[in-house]
A protein has these predicted regions:
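CN hydrolase (nitrilase-like) catalytic-core segments centered on the catalytic cysteine
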Residues: 83-99, 158, 168-256
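A short, flexible beta-alpha/helix-coil linker loop
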Residues: 21-26, 63-64, 69, 220
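Eukaryotic scaffold repeat domains enriched in small/polar residues
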Residues: 30-35, 46-48, 94, 98, ...
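Cys-nucleophile CN-hydrolase/nitrilase-fold catalytic domain and related Cys-dependent amidase chemistry
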Residues: 33-122, 126-128, 191-209
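Active-site catalytic loop in hydrolytic enzyme cores
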Residues: 107-182, 187-204, 228
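Short beta->alpha transition motifs characteristic of CBS
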Residues: 69-71, 117, 128-135, 233, ...
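C-terminal beta-strand edge segments of enzyme domains
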Residues: 3, 150, 217-333
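N-terminal active-site segment of His-dependent metallophosphoesterases
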Residues: 1-55, 185
Length: 333
């Protein structure tokens, strides 16, 4: 069931509008507010053009842009409660639609955060997340320290947000699903060389966790004519691609998902109920399944002793090669 990608919503459907936002050019503080206002116009237009949309999702970097020369300029960063978010929250309230947004956020205690915020249809913040796995060494952001939150959304959705490179680590989607998420949003700024990995991880994150994944990247050229991919994608709970976008800047790609289907599958599937079976290994032979943790990497991570066999030979261990200098120097100025 697709309901014509949300034109005729199935009962219980969550209709998504994934915006392949044009890469913005940010040169001065006023550009941030102007960009937020442009995105707010897209939010209002999407809801007006397709009133069935419940949630509009903007990609990573859609306010702050992709120019690394601006990323540690304190005047070109945002605040969680700053004017840019006020504009976007106002658009959600006016249009009566939920929204998911991205900001590069000031951090008085260190390197900036790469943050995502979900706003409901009354303009209230419902989820706040800091990217846990920055795309090192290219990105200078502080690693998120708040875990992966989950919030209630429209139509029975339990929403989680992971950002860009987060989705390349299967543990991230697994954690979101383990905490109850049945719809996992993924926002990104990826360019075309990452296209294949983007597709397979979006599908795998859905299948491995019996969750819908809804993912979108920036689109169009940056100042050097390097294009972000767009490539909005919604995957069913079995990993099947329901809807896939292209590279068109500012295209709103729509799709419907039915959160109750994910909930039901998690209860009724036998084979391939992987998120349950991870903690109940071999339950056909062992009452309740084996409940131990046989994974060395998990044990070492918990103990603070995570170390790959080739650790001493890894070439890139800080951002110096990407021009950021040693970690102690990575601060907004």
């Amino acid at each position: 069931m697709t309901g014509l990608d949300g034109l005729n919503p199935t009962p219980g459907a969550l209709v998504l509008g994934l915006v392949q936002a044009q890469v913005p050019t940010i040169r001065e503080p006023g550009d941030l507010k102007a960009t937020a206002e442009r995105l707010a116009g897209i939010v209002r237009g999407a809801k007006k053009g397709m009133p069935t949309i419940d949630l509009v999702v903007m990609p990573e970097y859609s306010i702050n842009g992709l120019d690394p020369q601006t990323w540690l300029d304190n005047t070109l960063l945002c605040d969680r409660d700053g004017p840019e978010m006020a504009v976007l929250a106002g658009a959600c309230r006016e249009a009566g639609v939920w929204g998911c947004f991205s900001i590069m956020e000031r951090n008085p205690g260190g390197a900036p955060w790469n943050s995502g915020i979900i706003i409901d249809d009354t303009g209230r913040e419902r989820l706040y997340y800091r990217k846990m796995h920055p795309w090192v060494p290219a990105e200078p952001w502080a690693p998120g320290d708040l875990g992966i939150p989950v919030c209630d959304g429209p139509s029975g959705a339990k929403l989680a947000l992971i950002i860009c490179h987060d989705g390349m680590l299967p543990e991230m989607a697994r954690e979101a699903a383990y905490k109850g998420a049945n719809v996992i949003l993924r926002t990104a700024g990826y360019t075309y060389p990452i296209r294949q990995a983007w597709q397979i991880t979006n599908q795998a994150n859905a299948f491995q966790n019996l969750a819908y994944t809804a993912s979108v990247a920036l689109a169009g050229p940056d100042g050097n004519n390097i294009w972000s991919q767009g490539e909005a994608m919604v995957c069913d709970i079995d990993g099947t691609v329901l809807v896939q976008g292209d590279g068109t800047p500012d295209r709103v790609v729509t799709a419907e998902v039915v959160p109750a289907r994910a909930d039901q599958a998690r209860l009724t599937w036998g084979v391939e109920n992987n998120i349950y079976q991870l903690g109940h290994r071999g339950y056909s032979a062992v009452e309740g399944g084996a409940r131990d943790c046989p994974y060395t990497f998990m044990q070492d991570l918990v103990n603070g002793t995570y170390r790959v066999p080739w650790e001493s030979g890894v070439h890139h261990v800080d951002g110096t090669g990407a021009g950021w200098g040693p970690p102690v120097e990575v601060r907004a100025r």
